[in-house]
């Protein structure tokens, strides 16, 4: 998801925890204040405690919120001088915060821009202006338990066949479940592998604003792979993420979608990081995950606090640099966005595997489409609602798929103006 006096070479790095809005008092003119969530904040604090001179003459204060939602709530409520100079979060908040005037544009040199892919800047831009620097790739990936499954599945059907053949003998709780990111964000791969995505991307990386997914084909795949002969869930793919991580670690689920922020939990439990995208219905194809970047964003409050220049320097010297991203991701554990950091031998195998999975099959996370209710519901609510309707309530998958396609198509049409 400001104190600024450098006395000698000592950097004061502080943390405060907030569940809601944190009122930030006027600060010394050399202090840069960063807001982040409950995981990024503590990790940033560790990094700045080890190295203090990213911006000579400035101190850094990290304010950590109790959750990602709490960070968002605080940013929404911030006004006057109560906001941060920089915050770290996902890219889907950009349109609303840019329109509200809470973000400030960032200008990078050609050399700095060359260290990132163009699509990453798309994620952090609005109205033709860049508002942050890419920090890390934000994605999920699928792993499989090699004590149960000896080889990587080539298709969605391979996974379903294994589950149906072994669920009783092995006491399986599910076949594929979502352990990271929830049923909407983390669960996009579950939709996409069967043929449904909230927006369609053209081959050149642009958005197809007029086309939605094929509801008939998607519903057919749902019937084939997720329902039994009576139209009830066959148990392969649960409608909820509850218990997924524990069940996978206990050997009761052969395939799981995990997040790039907690892959080490599985690695430390002895599971190999055979990370890949969820295989599609056709062998050799893969379901798409959200593969956007999280960013470090410059706010308009930095100018009000008199620290716009050092805050911009922190963005480039730390957040957008090879050394900075390597140092940060040593604590955070996500795949770095910067090209030099991606190649570093200090970046762990699990991080690189997550990054490779995102490169193989992902779509950008476009908040203008995902956050709007123009179609009757936003993506975040409508996605899990589909699985509840079909897998729990027993509703017709085609009827519900047509509703979903219409909702998502309307949301894309409405969100076009916010790109």
Features from the language model and the residues they span:
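Extracytoplasmic/periplasmic substrate-recognition and gating elements
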Residues: 267-333
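A structural signal for short loop-to-beta-strand junctions that line the ligand-binding cleft
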Residues: 77, 84-85, 113-147, 284-289, ...
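Short helices/loops that flank or line small-molecule/ion binding pockets
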Residues: 71-83, 99-100, 161-169, 242-256, ...
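Glycine-centered hinge/linker elements that transmit conformational signals in sensory
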Residues: 206-238
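Long, aromatic- and glycine/proline-rich binding clefts that accommodate carbohydrate-like moieties
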Residues: 276, 329-381, 387-389, 415-419
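Hinge/lid segment of periplasmic solute-binding proteins
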Residues: 91-139, 151, 156-160, 276
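Conserved N-terminal structural module of periplasmic/extracytoplasmic solute-binding proteins
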Residues: 4, 8, 14-15, 19-21, ...
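Extracytoplasmic/periplasmic solute-binding protein
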Residues: 131-135, 140, 159-210, 253
